């Protein structure tokens, strides 16, 4: 057929016959059709194959799932059995525990029942005993009332009188017992305290060697002759008035041969007047202008001497780093005395003693020395400022010292404050050692006699005292008491009361011994 088309078909411009072209076209179409059919068949084959593979996989997965499900089911059954067994065991254990608790509760209930029964029995017994006791007490009260009536009839005393007598007797016995025990404790405590104090003081004294100082400020200036008295007085007394006005002292020119007495309460003024008067006597030129010049120069020399004395005293006391104001004020104490004892030398001794006592007690030695050295600084200005020298000194030290320990030592060394620290006790002990040793201090005859009379008046003011005597220069008081009014224990109380009144009402150096003497004499005659 193709050949027919090829033979009969006309030719084209390309030279190929139309039939050839149609043959090629039909061949191409047929190839496409057969290729599509082949492709469809092949694709169907492939799809069938994949389908079979998928079916096999699905079958396998289904089988595996069944196996796995079976395993899971078996495991679940096993876990369920295990949980059931555990629950059954726990339930069994709880039932057993509940049974035990029930048994215990029953036992406790039985025990409580028994106790309740016992309590009821005891209550009944106590009720019976209470009735018996009430009956017995009633009988005793009746017997007591009867006996009291009989005693009142026999003793001719009422009940209140008997009670009063018994209380008085008991009070006397208790007072005697209390006094006896107080005496025993007092002896014991004093012995222990004295032993410890002796140890500390002896250690301090062994390490300190100080001079005995009893000097006083010079009040009398010697004159080369009595003619100098007239020159000192001057025409119409102008020289002596100028000298008294420039120095602030009183010059006493009396019948005492070749001597002029300087009188003033201010030791510094007294020293300035002494030096100025000595220079005027040596120079010989005595007139108001010269007096003013010499007095001004004497003031400068005394101030320089005070500073030098203060520095020297601080060096001897082992106290360093003091401010110039303190040095100058301490130098004034060179011209200040207390009961005849030079206060500056006393301050040096107290500083040394305080340091040694502080070292024995284990405190700061430097601060102890400093407090001891400054403890009497208030005496340098106590004539110009109101207050005790401890208050004045504490106020002055607060301005220049930062250490509270030093301030406490100055303020508390006379126990003027409500509380006393260890620094106050250290300085007080050192002050007592320096001032109370023999020869350290002395007092005027007038003050001495007043103190003796005051001691005897204090002792005589107590009931039962017959006579008192102040002896040993006022360091001991002996009291004679009436034996019918004061017994032995009362004598102890009397001594303690007198000591307390002396401590509260008198100022004195050192310590005063109080001795109470009770004498009983029994006299009879043989016939």
UniProtKB/Swiss-Prot annotation:
User: Which keywords has UniProt assigned to this entry?
Assistant: Cell membrane, Endonuclease, Hydrolase, Membrane, Nuclease, RNA-binding, Transmembrane, Transmembrane helix
Alphabetically, the GO molecular function entries are:
RNA binding; RNA endonuclease activity
Q: What is its EC number?
A: 3.1.-.-
**Keyword Transcription part of the UniProt annotation:** no
Q: Where in the cell is it found?
A: Cell membrane
According to the UniProt record, one GO cellular component term is: plasma membrane
Q: Where is this region: Disordered?
A: 83-117
- Specify the KH domain's residue ranges: 217-302
Segments passing through the bilayer: 21-41
Q: How does it sit in the membrane?
A: Single-pass membrane protein
Identify the main location.
membrane
- What protein does this entry describe? Ribonuclease Y
Recite the lineage of the species.
Bacteria, Bacillati, Chloroflexota, Dehalococcoidia, Dehalococcoidales
* Gene that specifies this protein: rny
């Amino acid at each position: 057929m193709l050949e027919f088309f090829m033979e009969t078909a006309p030719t084209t411009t390309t030279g190929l016959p139309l039939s050839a072209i149609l043959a090629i076209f039909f061949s191409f179409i047929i190839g496409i059709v057969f290729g599509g059919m082949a492709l469809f068949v092949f694709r169907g084959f492939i799809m069938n194959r994949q389908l079979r593979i998928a079916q096999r996989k699905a079958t396998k997965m289904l089988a595996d799932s069944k196996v796995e499900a079976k395993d899971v089911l078996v495991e679940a059954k096993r876990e369920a059995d295990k949980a059931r067994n555990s629950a059954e065991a726990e339930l069994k254990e709880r039932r057993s525990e509940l049974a035990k608790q029930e048994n215990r509760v029953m036992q406790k209930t039985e025990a409580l029942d028994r106790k309740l029964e016992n309590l009821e029995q005891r209550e009944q017994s106590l009720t019976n005993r209470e009735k018996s006791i009430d009956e017995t007490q009633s009988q005793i009260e009746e017997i007591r009332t009867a006996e009291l009536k009989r005693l009142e009839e026999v003793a001719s005393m009422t009940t209140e009188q008997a009670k009063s007598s018994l209380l008085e007797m008991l009070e006397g016995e208790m007072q005697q017992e209390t006094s006896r025990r107080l005496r025993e404790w007092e002896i014991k405590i004093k012995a222990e305290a004295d032993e410890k104090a002796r140890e500390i003081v002896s250690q301090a004294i062994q390490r300190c060697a100080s001079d005995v100082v009893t000097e006083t400020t010079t009040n009398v200036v010697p004159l080369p002759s009595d003619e100098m008295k007239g020159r000192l007085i001057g025409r119409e007394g102008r020289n002596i008035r100028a000298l008294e006005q420039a120095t602030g002292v009183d010059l006493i020119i009396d019948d005492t041969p070749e001597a002029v007495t300087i009188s003033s309460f201010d030791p510094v003024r007294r020293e300035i007047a002494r030096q100025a008067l000595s220079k005027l006597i040596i120079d010989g030129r005595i007139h108001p202008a010269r007096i003013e010049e010499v007095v001004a120069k004497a003031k400068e020399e005394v101030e320089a001497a005070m500073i030098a004395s203060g520095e020297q005293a601080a060096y001897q006391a082992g106290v360093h780093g003091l401010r110039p104001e303190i040095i100058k004020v301490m130098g004034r104490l060179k011209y200040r005395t207390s009961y005849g004892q030079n206060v500056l030398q006393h301050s040096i001794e107290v500083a040394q003693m305080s340091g040694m006592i502080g070292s024995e007690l284990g405190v700061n030695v430097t601060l102890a020395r400093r407090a001891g050295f400054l403890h009497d600084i208030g005496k340098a200005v106590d004539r110009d400022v109101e207050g005790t020298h401890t208050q004045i000194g504490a106020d002055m030290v607060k301005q220049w010292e930062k250490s509270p320990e030093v301030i406490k030592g100055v303020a508390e060394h006379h126990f003027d404050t409500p509380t006393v620290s260890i620094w106050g006790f250290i300085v007080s002990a050192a002050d007592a050692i320096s001032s109370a040793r023999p020869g350290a201090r002395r007092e005027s005859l007038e003050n001495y006699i007043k103190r003796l009379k005051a001691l005897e008046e204090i002792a005589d003011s107590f009931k039962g005292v017959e006579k008192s005597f102040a002896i040993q220069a006022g360091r001991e008081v002996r009291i004679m008491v009436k034996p019918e009014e004061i017994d032995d224990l009362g004598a102890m109380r009397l001594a303690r009361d007198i000591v307390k009144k002396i401590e509260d009402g008198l100022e004195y150096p050192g310590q005063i011994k109080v001795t109470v003497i009770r004498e009983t004499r029994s006299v009879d005659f043989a016939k």
